[in-house]
């Protein structure tokens, strides 16, 4: 009996751990096309009635083969995200994707995806990429970086701060990324800290960054753009 109880407990722990590690809930049917007009609020979207689903719920003419405009971006990049908000058929499937265009010397600034791991491949040009670990016991945050060329692949673990930078002075770069959530979210670090609405107290930020309040006030006065479309 004791042995049976032990194995039952082990199985339950494994089941709970599996659920805790999942980015998005696993689907319980073939598909669950998002009903974005439903008044019901759930974690994700409720399903559209299966009899009303058609092939266009799984299709989007996204024009990802076309270069995107980076000229209006201070960061020199343009992220075209295809998530459940644009493609209803992604609901419950735990995946999304993005095309990222980089101007010469452009970057996708340091940011995190709180709900997804990202895997990225370079289609054109060269990218300097990296991510930083969470706070370690020794007080360090380790930086992992790599220079990627066309066809190379790099993975950014879920929730960690990461970036991509085009080092070329005269050539643009293009990448495609896949993310392990239908709605991965993005928190651009500088935008969140210095461009929040309402502003974080300059007393807090001056102490945190060990600079005077004038530097904080100047940073908060800047326009912090969102390069994600």
UniProtKB/Swiss-Prot annotation:
SUPFAM superfamilies, per the entry: RmlC-like cupins (SSF51182)
Q: Where, by residue number, does Mn(2+) bind? A: 111, 113, 118, 162
Ranges for domain Cupin type-1 come to 62-217
Q: Which UniProt keywords apply?
A: Apoplast, Disulfide bond, Glycoprotein, Manganese, Metal-binding, Secreted, Signal
| First-listed, main subcellular location of the protein, grouped into a coarse class | secreted
Q: Which residues are glycosylated?
A: 78
Name the Gene3D superfamilies for this protein: Jelly Rolls (2.60.120.10)
Origin: domain of life: Eukaryota
Q: Where is the signal peptide?
A: 1-22
The compartments listed are: Secreted, Extracellular space, Apoplast
Provide a Gene Ontology MF annotation, just one: manganese ion binding
- Matches recorded under SMART domains: Cupin_1
GO CC entries = apoplast
Q: Name one Pfam family in it.
A: Cupin_1
InterPro entries, per the entry: Cupin_1 (IPR006045), Germin (IPR001929), Germin_Mn-BS (IPR019780), RmlC-like_jellyroll (IPR014710), RmlC_Cupin_sf (IPR011051)
The disulfide bonds in this chain are: 32-47
Job of this protein: May play a role in plant defense. Probably has no oxalate oxidase activity even if the active site is conserved.
The record's subunit annotation is: Oligomer (believed to be a pentamer but probably hexamer).
What family is this protein classified in? Belongs to the germin family.
Name the UniProt record assigns to this protein? Germin-like protein 12-2
